[in-house]
Amino acid sequence: MDNRLLEILVCPLCKGKLEYDRAAQELICHADKLAYPIRDGIPVMLADEARQSVPGRVIDPAAPRTE
């Protein structure tokens, strides 16, 4: 995932910051508790494609943060 892209992407619902989960290939919105999939390197920023994220899930500390 390109760091420049991570800096500008926001949650489509709340416009909040997203956190990259490298292991799961997802962008996590902690405010809405949603995880947006990344498919073939492309973030799918559609609410219908998001899944409920797991509270307290540990995100890869080596992954770049956009917060």
From Swiss-Prot:
InterPro entries: Trm112-like (IPR005651). GO terms for cellular component: cytosol. SUPFAM superfamilies: Trm112p-like. It comes from the Bacteria. This is UPF0434 protein Reut_A0592. Disulfide bonds: none annotated. Pfam families: Trm112p. Belongs to the UPF0434 family.
